[in-house]
Amino acid sequence: MAASSSSAASFFGVRQDDQSHLLPPNSSAAAPPPPPPHHQAPLPPLEAPPQKKKRNQPRTPNSDAEVIALSPKTLMATNRFICEVCNKGFQREQNLQLHRRGHNLPWKLKQKSTKEVKRKVYLCPEPSCVHHDPSRALGDLTGIKKHYYRKHGEKKWKCDKCSKRYAVQSDWKAHSKTCGTKEYRCDCGTLFSRRDSFITHRAFCDALAQESARHPTSLTSLPSHHFPYGQNTNNSNNNASSMILGLSHMGAPQNLDHQPGDVLRLGSGGGGGGAASRSSSDLIAANASGYFMQEQNPSFHDQQDHHHHHQQGFLAGNNNIKQSPMSFQQNLMQFSHDNHNSAPSNVFNLSFLSGNNGVTSATSNPNAAAAAAVSSGNLMISNHYDGENAVGGGGEGSTGLFPNNLMSSADRISSGSVPSLFSSSMQSPNSAPHMSATALLQKAAQMGSTSSNNNNGSNTNNNNNASSILRSFGSGIYGENESNLQDLMNSFSNPGATGNVNGVDSPFGSYGGVNKGLSADKQSMTRDFLGVGQIVKSMSGSGGFQQQQQQQQQQQQQQQHGNSRERVGSSSDSADRSSMNVNTGGGPASTSPPYGIHHASF
């Protein structure tokens, strides 16, 4: 130890006598022997810091001190000594004596005596005051007066700058000289002109900072499902696009294997994380421009040949707003044939609320593979990321109507399945057999036709567009399941539920926010929440639903033509008969009412 210490000292050029006082006191045994006493400088004794002297400490009064207790009226009197000639008052007796000299009255000034003057102390007349005790009496008449004014009197003087009041005029004058000239700045940036206000505010800020240090509430500590649209709040495009769907805090944690098998499955059980896990910032692309999509591959068949393409769905796109209606519909109708994670192949597998657990569904449901070969896993939405643990489609972006990772994050609340928007049933994919697309469309049309009669001949109020969308995805998701299904099905058979966006036919109906071209004769009371009514009607190869609709329209047209022909024929017959009556003179000619209704007798 000594050798290492000496070597270190020689290396750094420190002498041995200078190194001795650097060692701790408990290492004296290992330290080298101290130098001779004449080399040590005596350390100065540590002086304790002087204690602050307290003012007006309680003490035993002098036995010879005169204790004077004045009344409040006497203390507050401004003129105690009054001249008997002119009734002028003075505060001091000396001033009165000098005044008497002007009246040629005998006057006498107090002379300083060589004898020791008896000390006087004054008590505060307020019983609750600490200076009411003789041991705390004040030894100055002016001091006791100012004390009584400040603590127990009325504050008559007011500062014009800060509105602070003072009871003593001298205090008010001193404050007026410094008010507004000095500023007190807090660490938070607040400025104060008064020191007392600054001290109070700074104490509050310090307490708040300590409380915040004990309980941090930063935004990064919150779960990511509180921000379903990503945490880039400075991007105006993300802010505008995030208003499209107000989806937050939907669903409770359920079993990962449970997936709803409804006709319109708006979200199913998602995995808790895996190879295809993505943050919620992938929901909306940075260049997303509202309802319009990018126009990269206008051909649908070319779209199928690309396995690694960008998001071209409803919410992902560039700033290319001006698109043709055909390209707009093609972008909406794009779905890939490479969807290997065989989720339940429902008609509208709208899993934009949460991803499906593609691993369990692919391994436990053998019918899903066959159904996926017919409908490519789903009819409208491609489920490339249809789960956090998806097997296939990991390299592709979403090309469906909505990106599948709308609610995906590491802390997503949809660790289980989310309740469906149109049904509250939570069932396993194996609980019900899969139906074909044609059968499901026919079933949906039958369910929608039951409530379509109540919605004829009325328009949708444009002011309720945004609120109805939010209600449909928010508060109404649990209480209006069945009615929402029927209302959405009604939009399939409603030809007037499409809007017009700057000359482009929008399939979102009256919920696009710009449906200015709707007329009163169109049936727009049905609520097309997802805008799939026009898309389904324009789909090719959708089974017997389109043919059935065309047949119904043809039958209605034939009935209308038949009725018009009968009316024309009956009106012509009535005209001939009336002319015959006039020519033959067989009675007064009867005028034929419209639609061939006769009242003439032959």
UniProtKB/Swiss-Prot annotation:
PROSITE patterns: ZINC_FINGER_C2H2_1, ZINC_FINGER_C2H2_2. The modification Phosphothreonine is found at T60. Residues 1-10, 21-30, 448-467, 546-560, 570-579 have a biased composition (Low complexity). InterPro entries: C2CH-3rd_BIRD-IDD, C2CH-4th_BIRD-IDD, C2H2-2nd_BIRD-IDD, IDD1-16, Znf_C2H2_sf, Znf_C2H2_type. One of its GO terms (molecular function) is transcription cis-regulatory region binding. A zinc finger (C2H2-type) spans 81-103, 122-152, 157-180. It comes from the Eukaryota. Residues 1-65, 443-467, 537-602 are annotated as: Disordered. Keywords: Activator, Chloroplast, DNA-binding, Metal-binding, Phosphoprotein, Plastid, Repeat, Transcription, Transcription regulation, Transit peptide, Zinc, Zinc-finger. GO terms for biological process: positive regulation of DNA-templated transcription; regulation of DNA-templated transcription. It holds the Pfam family C2H2-2nd_BIRD-IDD. GO terms for cellular component: chloroplast. Zn(2+) 2 binds at C186, C188, H201, C205. A zinc finger (CCHC-type) spans 184-207. This is Protein indeterminate-domain 5, chloroplastic. It comes from Arabidopsis thaliana.
